[in-house]
Amino acid sequence: SPYLDSFSLKAFESIWTNRRFGRTLYPVTTRRKFITTTGSTMAAASIAPAADADKDAPLLSFGLIADCQYADVDPAGTRFYRQSAAKLDQAVNQLNRHDLRFSLHLGDFIDRDFKSFTELKPVITKLKSRLYHALGNHDFDVEEHLKSKVPSELGLTSTYYAFHHAGFRFLVLDTTEVSTYRYPGKNAATLSAQEELRALAAAGKPYAQSWNGRVSDRQFLWLTEQLKQATDAGESVLVFGHHPILPEEAHCTWNCGALHKLLSQFPCCKAYLNGHRHSGGHQFKDGMHYLTLHGMLDTQDNAFSLAHLHRSCLEIEGFGRQQSRTISFR
């Protein structure tokens, strides 16, 4: 097949079999590609050439995974739910070969059923680097009485938070905080979110979808304060979440316009990275990069990344279906 033809002899020699999940996995190969693309809102409007990544040494590297979305169920279309455990295991083994400061999973760690978290633990606990999670809509597709336990199951004491490394402030948002699925069905917050969704649909917004959500007003104020503090401290900022902000389409967070306006006002803010839209995407607007990573779940091929952070750019080294690219900072 074309997929197998793309492997080098060295890759064939390292074929390994995951007997637990009953299939042979071919290690994803990667090369660092530095892509300049024009003409599409889904493509990069400001992609650096390869030389830019060499202007300064990497400050640190970290792992990136989006939409593992595991469940012990049969495939449906292009979604291979059960196979995601083996894909995650493959990603963990690859990430463990590198000196990573941390790793991030950008939401939808599971597809459904609270037991799915337990079934992934033997895989994810092998990861050597510290793992941070952003919450996704499918993470709450569990029994109603267990919804409140999801954040702690993912090791979160707060559903949105900040951490610091090498002169950068990393902000992880909770774009599920206001949504129709986060809380039990008769909860006042759920009823309020349902009303908000109806209003967005009446206004013709493409992102008026039940699988989306937004940050709360309180979280928005927290984000604003974090950006102000980073500016005062001379820090650069990378922001992460599950739902896209741009380009504006059916997968975006409900308050994507307000978030874009806020982030673009702060020169310290360099990029927003997210999952949710499994086919990926990129847009550059008003000095900000908005990068959607490919979902691990889709197709039999894997998708994950190494991110190499430089002072002047972020180099994404993609594996499997994930494209490699370098985005230059303003």
Regions found by a protein language model. Give the residues of each.
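N-terminal twin-arginine translocation
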Residues: 19-22, 26-33, 43-55
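Extended active-site neighborhood of metal-dependent phosphoesterases/phosphodiesterases
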Residues: 54, 114-233, 258-268, 282-318, ...
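N-terminal active-site segment of His-dependent metallophosphoesterases
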Residues: 50-118, 218
